[in-house]
């Protein structure tokens, strides 16, 4: 199935009212009582007038339907040549400022403000400079929107492709629409991988995590790279799924991702 040849409607390209809508859904699913947002309880987040969250559900229907093993390979081949556009970092930050929508009920913050708050919270807690930089850059991969990429190919919980899907991934029922679900090469426990092969050998669904990791992989320590590459892989670091693909080094390194996750989720402050 050649997903890049498929034509999507405007609604299918942008099912969410804003990219923050996905992040707020994650916040609702994974609250941490010991981390408080200033003047706002966890129960107050995601206060939409329509409680059905139809846009988030539609977003995941599209994400789980079209994020196939072949789709991920195609996107890597397309975008990891880094031949699309060149811009200074501050221009990229200015672009991220456009990725906010008045329909987001939780905050009027743009994406750049979220990055500033994340990095400042990390600095305030005395973490090393490389981690502060990681916080500042962790969502920079959302510049994929510059290239008219569908939202579901930029944000969303990430997961391994090329093997069976975990039922702990949000809205797992939508994977039945994915052609890999019935492909015997991809729908077994290990799929195209070997037991404990290590995440470096596993393809993860395509989006901003992988893109910014590939951009920065030669510039920050490995601990920060784990934070970048897997910060949306909630089925692993919140649910403990796909442990059979991990090697000992993955298990050791994830403690750094665990340190980063609260800053990503809970630093957002209006």
Q: Predicted regions span which residues?
A:
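Residues that form generic nucleotide/phosphate-binding pockets
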Residues: 59-62, 78-82, 92-99, 215, ...
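Divalent metal-dependent catalytic cores for phosphoryl transfer on phosphate-bearing substrates
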Residues: 107-270
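Tryptophan-centered motif/residue detector
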Residues: 22-25, 90-93, 130, 206
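A generic structural signal for ordered alpha-helices
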Residues: 34-37, 70, 74, 96-100, ...
């Amino acid at each position: 199935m050649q997903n890049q040849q498929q034509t999507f409607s405007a609604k299918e390209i942008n099912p969410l009212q804003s990219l923050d809508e996905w992040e707020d859904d994650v916040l609702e699913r994974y609250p941490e009582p010991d981390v408080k947002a200033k003047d706002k309880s966890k129960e107050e987040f995601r206060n939409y007038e329509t409680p059905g969250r139809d846009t988030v559900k539609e977003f995941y229907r599209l994400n789980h339907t079209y994020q196939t093993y072949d789709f991920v390979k195609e996107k890597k081949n397309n975008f990891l040549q880094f031949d699309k556009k060149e811009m200074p970092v501050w221009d990229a930050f200015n672009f991220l400022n456009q990725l906010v929508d008045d329909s987001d009920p939780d905050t009027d913050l743009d994406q750049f403000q979220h990055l500033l708050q994340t990095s400042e919270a990390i600095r305030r807690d005395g973490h090393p400079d490389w981690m502060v930089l990681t916080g500042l850059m962790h969502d920079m991969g959302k510049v994929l929107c510059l290239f008219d990429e569908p939202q579901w190919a930029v944000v969303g919980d990430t997961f391994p492709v090329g093997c069976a899907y975990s039922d702990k991934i949000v809205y797992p029922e939508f994977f039945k629409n994915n052609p890999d679900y019935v492909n015997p090469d991809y729908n077994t426990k290990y799929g195209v991988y070997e037991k404990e092969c290590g995440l470096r050998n596993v393809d993860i669904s395509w989006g901003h995590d992988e893109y910014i990791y590939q951009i920065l992989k030669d510039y920050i320590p490995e601990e920060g790279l784990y934070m970048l590459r897997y910060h949306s892989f909630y089925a692993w670091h919140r649910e403990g799924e796909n442990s059979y693909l991990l090697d000992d080094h993955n298990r050791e390194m994830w403690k750094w991702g665990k340190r980063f996750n609260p800053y990503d989720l809970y630093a957002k402050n209006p």
